[in-house]
């Protein structure tokens, strides 16, 4: 029997490198909105295609933007 061929996942393009963005700022709401879901949750790295370091910076920037009411907190709550 022939060995099954292993499929490799297609590498995702990094949206920050494609747009030539080096600085992630909490005041750049348009950029940060690309990394949060319609419910306001931070999207996972495997979904967005960013590096570990970039994901940390994005998460921190989103949290800072939420603190100063530029972005909503996740979920609408009950009722």
Curated annotation (Swiss-Prot):
GO BP of this protein: translation
GO MF annotation: an example: structural constituent of ribosome
UniProt keyword terms in alphabetical order: Ribonucleoprotein, Ribosomal protein, RNA-binding, rRNA-binding
GO cellular component: cytosolic small ribosomal subunit
Family designation: Belongs to the bacterial ribosomal protein bS18 family.
Role summary: Binds as a heterodimer with protein bS6 to the central domain of the 16S rRNA, where it helps stabilize the platform of the 30S subunit.
NCBIfam families in alphabetical order: S18
Subunit structure: Part of the 30S ribosomal subunit. Forms a tight heterodimer with protein bS6.
UniProt-recorded name of the protein: Small ribosomal subunit protein bS18
Gene: rpsR
């Amino acid at each position: 029997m022939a060995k099954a061929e292993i499929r490799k996942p297609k590498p995702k393009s990094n949206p920050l490198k494609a747009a030539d963005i080096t600085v992630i700022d909490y005041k750049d709401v348009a950029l940060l909105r690309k990394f949060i879901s319609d419910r306001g949750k931070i999207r996972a790295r495997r979904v967005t295609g960013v590096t570990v370091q970039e994901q940390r910076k994005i998460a921190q920037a989103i949290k800072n933007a939420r603190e100063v009411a530029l972005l909503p907190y996740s979920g609408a709550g009950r009722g």
